[in-house]
Amino acid sequence: MSPLVAVLVFFSAALGVPGTGVAGNPHGLDAIFEPPVTPAPPTRAPRREELEWDDEDHPLLGLEPPVGSRCHPYIAYSLPPDMTAVTSVVVKPYCSPPEVILWASGTAYLVNPFVAIQALAIGEPLNEAALKELGEVAVHKDSLPPLRYNGGPPAE
């Protein structure tokens, strides 16, 4: 077989052109590459809201990150309308450990690193039983819209 014919046979097999194949690969490139992975279904992302810092009574204005933590500037979220019990949440995912601050109507803020992250990630309602066990927030259902702003110092 001439070198030119050998090169043509090699590339035709590699590109999937029917033929003898190359090195045990009768299907060309289709057999080399694995089939694409089916992407996970999209989740409902929380809405990001603009931060406002003209309210001197806002509970987070004096909140400092834990000593020694590497925190990204605070990220503010409003819960999707079908989530109940808590009206707003601030997630600081780059802290170690991550911090989540939840509000329920008429209560102070609550720091909890697990419940809200799971709810936001999978788009399911917050686990009210888990919040009740913490004893720091009045868990109830309401129809109030998310707060206009909800936490953290302004990004520089």
Curated annotation (Swiss-Prot):
Glycoprotein: present as a keyword of the record? yes
Q: Which UniProt keywords apply?
A: Disulfide bond, Fusion of virus membrane with host cell membrane, Fusion of virus membrane with host membrane, Glycoprotein, Host cell membrane, Host Golgi apparatus, Host membrane, Membrane, Signal, Viral envelope protein, Viral penetration into host cytoplasm, Virion, Virus entry into host cell
- InterPro entries reported for this sequence: Herpes_gL_N, Herpes_gL_N_sf, HSV_GL_alphagamma
Q: Does the keyword Glycoprotein apply?
A: yes
Q: Which Gene3D superfamilies match?
A: 3.30.390.170
Signal sequence coordinates: 1-16
**Which Gene Ontology terms of cellular component type are present?**
host cell Golgi apparatus; host cell plasma membrane; membrane; viral envelope; virion membrane
Which biological process, per GO, is one annotated for this protein? symbiont entry into host cell
Q: Where is the chain membrane-spanning?
A: none
Q: Which residue numbers delimit the gL alphaherpesvirus-type domain?
A: 50-156
PTM remark: O-glycosylated, and sialylated.
Stated family: Belongs to the herpesviridae glycoprotein L (gL) family. Alphaherpesvirinae gL subfamily.
Q: How does it assemble?
A: Interacts with glycoprotein H (gH); this interaction is necessary for the correct processing and cell surface expression of gH. The heterodimer gH/gL seems to interact with gB trimers during fusion.
> Which protein, by its recorded name, is this?
Envelope glycoprotein L
| Organism annotation | Suid herpesvirus 1 (strain Kaplan) (SuHV-1)
